[in-house]
C-alpha cells in the first residue's frame, strides 16, 4: 500500500470509532469475570485504545417496580430474571450514547462493583502473557492502535439478556434495539448443575433500591410500556440508595433457570438424543417441558449470529479468555486493514 493510499484509508475511518463487545449467558456463567479479564488485557495495550465495562445489572428497574410472579409451588416472589425487570429503553439509549460519545453517560452510575468479586481462576502471569501477545499482534496489523493515530474505544457489555433471535425468525423483539448495537456477541453456556451451585452460594446482590415518590418522569420505563419515555443521559444519576437482594430458597429452580431457558429458547437446542420436534412445540407453550428437553442447557446453536464459547461451560476460564480475545481481535484487525 502506498503512502497516499494509506492516507485515504485512514481518512475513511470513523472518528474515534466504538466497538461494543456483548458478553451474555446464564446466571453465574462467568460473564462479569470475563468482562473484567478482557478489560485488564486490553486497557494497557495503547494510549489510543480506551476500554471500559458496562453492566446490564445497572439497568434494573427500582426494587418496587420489579414484577412479581407465582411459582408452580404457589409462592409469590419478585422475578429479577425476566426482561420486564430491566429498563430496556434506558439500556438502549445508554448504549447509543456510548457509541456516539465513547464514554458512559453521566446518568449511569454502576453499582455492580459493590457486589462481591470471585477469583477469576486466571493467574497474573497468564494475563501478562496474553497482554504481550495482543500487543504484538496489533503491531503486526497496523500502527493506528499502537502508534500515533485516532483513538478507538472498546466496550465490554455484560449481562444475562442482551441478544435477540435472528430477524428472519422473529421480526420484532424487545431486545432488538440493544442487540443491533452490539458488534461482537459472545455467549457463555453453562450447565444447569453448575449454575445452581454457583448461584446458591452467592450471598446476594446490591440493587437500585425503591423508586422515589412521586416517581421521577425521566428515570426509566418498563420494557412493556407502550410509550418510550425520554431519558436525560447527561443528567447526574438520581437513583435512590441501594438495597440488597438475597435469593429465597428454591429461586434457581423456580425462577432463574426456567426464565433463562424460556428467553433463550431460540438459541438453545435439545439435549443430545432428545426429540427436536417436541422441543419446537414446547418453545411455544410448555415451559416445564422445555426445561426438561433442554436438560443441562449446554447445546447451543452456532448459526444465530452469536459466537458460542467452546467447551459447553466445562473449560477453565483461562481457555475461555483466550477464545474471547480472538473474537475481540477480529473487528480490531479488520479496522486496521
Label each residue range with its predicted role:
Residues 52-55, 59-124:
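Conserved nucleotide-sensing/catalytic segment adjacent to the nucleotide-binding pocket
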Residues 1-22, 26, 37, 43-52:
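Extreme N-terminal, non-catalytic leader segments
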Residues 206-279:
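Acidic, metal/cofactor-coordinating or nucleic-acid-engaging core segments within structured domains
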Residues 2-12, 41, 202-205, 251-337:
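NTP-dependent small-molecule kinase module
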Residues 131-212:
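ATP-dependent NMP and nucleoside kinases share a basic, alpha-helical "lid"
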Residues 31:
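Conserved lysine of the Walker
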Residues 110-150, 163-166, 171, 175, ...:
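Conformational switch/transducer regions in large eukaryotic molecular machines and scaffolds
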Residues 10-17, 128-153, 229-246, 250, ...:
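Intrinsically disordered, low-complexity acidic Ser/Thr-rich regulatory segments
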